[in-house]
Structure formats: C-alpha cells, structure tokens
Design a protein with these regions (language model features):
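C-terminal transmembrane helical hairpin of 12-TM major facilitator-type secondary transporters
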Residues: 204-249
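A membrane-interface helix-boundary motif in multi-pass transporters
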Residues: 57-84, 171, 288-313
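Juxtamembrane intracellular "pre-TM" segments in multi-pass secondary transporters
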Residues: 99-140, 161, 165-167, 335
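Helix-to-loop junctions at the C-terminal end of transmembrane segments
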Residues: 188-203, 290
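Cytoplasmic helix-loop-helix junction between adjacent transmembrane helices
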Residues: 2-41
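Intracellular juxtamembrane helix-capping segments at the cytosolic ends
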Residues: 11-26, 244-260
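Multi-pass alpha-helical transporter architecture, strongest
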Residues: 87-97, 221, 305-335
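Glycine-rich segments within core transmembrane alpha-helices of 12-TM secondary carriers
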Residues: 32-60, 272-282
Length: 335
C-alpha cells in the first residue's frame, strides 16, 4: 500500500507534462503534440508489461545467477527494481533536458511551504467555480478513467481464469503481450493518426468517437471465445478509443483554459486530482462487482463488471451533450 501511495503521489508529473506541452504549443500544434506525449505513454504501456512479464520469476526464466532460493521466493522483485531504475532515469533526463517553459515574468512567485499544503489540497473544490465547459471536460475525463480502470483492474482476473470456467487461461507473459499490443495501437493512433485526423475533423468529435469506441470495446469483454483474433479486435477498439480520447480531451481542456484566462497547470492539476479519485474508485468498484458476480449465472456473471464499465463510458459520452449556459457561450464568442 505504501508503494502504491508513493507511485500515485508521483503521478503529479502527468499534469505538469501536459501543462508544459500547453505552454509551448500553439492551438494548431496542440493535437499533434498532445498525441505525441500520449504516444510516449502508449510506448511505455506497450514495452513495460512485456518487459515485466519477461523479467518475472527470473529463477525459472533465466536460471544461472538467479537460480537461487531468494529469487524463487521473490519472483516480482526484478521487474519492480527495473521499473524503479527507469523512473530514476526519467527524473535525471527531465532535470538535464527540459528548460523552464515560461519566461521569468510569467512565473508564479509563490513559495511552497507547509502553510500552503492545505491550500493546495483544497484545489479540487475550485472545480465548482470553473466555467461549465471546463467542468464538463474534467468530469468527462474522470468518468472515462473510472470505466477504463474498472476494466484494467479485472481484465487479468478474467484472462487468468481457466478456459473451462469461461476465461482465457493466459499466464503473465501472455497478458504482457496483450498489453504490448494495446500500447502499439495507442502509439499508432496518438503518434501519427491523431495529427492527421485533427486537420480534417473537429477535436471535440474525435474525443466523442474515442469514448464511443472504448465503450463498445469494454462492453464486448469477455469475448465469445478465446480466439486470439477476437481478443485483439476488442482490445483494438479499446486502445484506439483511448488513443483518440486522451490527446483530444487534453487539447480541448488546454484551449478552454486559455479562452477563460485560467492557469493551465492549475486546471491540469485539478483534472489529475479527479482522475486519481477515479483510479481509486474504479478498481475497488470493479473488484466488488467481480467478487459478487464471478460465480453467478444469467445476467450476473463474470461478464457483469465489463458491461458496467461499458455503461460508465457511455455515461461519460452523455456528459458532453449537457447544454452550456447562454452566458458562457456569449463570453467565449467575445473572447
């Protein structure tokens, strides 16, 4: 739990990275650059699980110096150690290669001390006074992540189930290959397609299509059979949907923040805060549904959690059809 807490605290770098891209990009450059940063996450998502699966249980996989009782008793230590070294390398690269994105006169002259911690922790409540367009985007992202993390928390439970019980009978390495494929699709969509698509279609439309594809994919789990082609088809829907959603939503949020004259880092921080709540609630909710339905029959079976995740994604889609106020539309027009 402590390790997960520290990892979650470190996720603040996501908001900073997106704000950095927003600071140095024009509106025309935003979709492509948000796509590139999303593609980098996708690349890690592609390679990471595969490496993790390969490094798991080195006593059995590699033998030699790892063929000891200690490595047999700690089969997951090597992938965790490798991940920690990668995180350290990332920090060093950020210090070495990234200059400050804002000129000195645009930087906030505020000291961060213990007196400001409470103020920073209450920033989530500032969502209530933000413009409706920004609130809708933040809530959409939060609900989308809720659906996505519900799937992510239970997908491996499903794939590890024996085939006779309705699962796929996959081991850690096979699951790693599946997630590597998901990452590959994400890299293709965010690293190349999103830039071209944003030149032909509205960014908001791309975001909505991404949510719809993800909802369809989530609702299609578990698959009718463990046939690899069907597995990859459904995961393609989810990966492509997420690949369209993430950069499009970040682009829209950046644009709306600029239109309303809001601090981009603060807005991104609020969004990541709500996203963190979704990442907490999603796995807990999914585990509860899974435990209550996995041995059921009829409508209440191991299918249920994935169907619920799909419905949650549809709810995220519906949030975007709530009307903006007339005052806000007029204000945006004048801006």
């Amino acid at each position: 739990l402590l390790a997960r807490f520290l990892a979650g605290a470190g996720n603040g770098n996501i908001a900073v990275a997106k704000a950095y891209i927003g600071d140095i990009s024009t509106r025309a450059e935003l979709p492509g650059r948000m796509g590139m940063i999303g593609a980098s996450f996708g690349l890690g998502f592609m390679i990471g699980p595969m490496i993790g699966g390969i490094l798991t249980d080195p006593a059995t996989s590699f033998g030699g110096p790892f063929d000891t009782q200690w490595w047999s008793d700690h089969p997951y230590f090597l992938p965790c150690l490798f991940a920690a070294l990668l995180s350290l390398s990332s920090m060093i690269l950020a210090i070495w290669l990234l200059p400050e994105s804002l000129p000195p006169n645009a930087r906030v002259k505020e000291k961060t001390d213990l007196k400001n911690v409470g103020k920073k922790l209450t920033n989530l409540s500032s969502i209530t006074i933000m413009p409706l367009s920004i609130r809708k985007l933040v809530y959409t992202n939060s609900v989308f992540l809720l659906a996505f993390t519900m799937m992510h928390a239970t997908f491996i439970l499903y794939t590890a189930m024996p085939i006779v019980d309705g699962g796929l009978g996959y081991d850690e390495r096979t699951n790693g290959y599946i997630f590597a494929y998901v990452g590959l699709v994400g890299v293709i969509v965010q690293g190349g397609l999103i830039r071209k698509l944003s030149e032909k279609f509205e960014v908001a439309s791309l975001m909505l299509v991404g949510i719809a594809l993800t909802a369809l994919g989530l609702g299609s789990i578990p698959y009718p059979s463990p046939t690899p082609l069907i597995v990859l088809l459904v995961m393609t829907l989810i990966a492509a949907g997420n690949g369209l959603f993430q950069p499009s939503q970040s682009t829209l949020l950046t644009h709306e923040s600029r239109v309303h004259g809001l601090d981009l880092g603060g807005v991104m921080g609020v969004q990541e805060g709500f996203g963190a709540l979704s990442r907490i609630i999603g796995p807990v909710l999914a585990a509860l549904i899974w435990s209550e339905t996995v041995d059921g029959i009829g409508l209440w079976t191991y299918h249920t959690v994935f169907r619920v995740a799909g419905l949650v994604a549809i709810f995220a889609l519906g949030l975007n059809y709530l009307p903006n106020s007339k005052i806000e539309k007029e204000g945006r027009h004048h801006d």
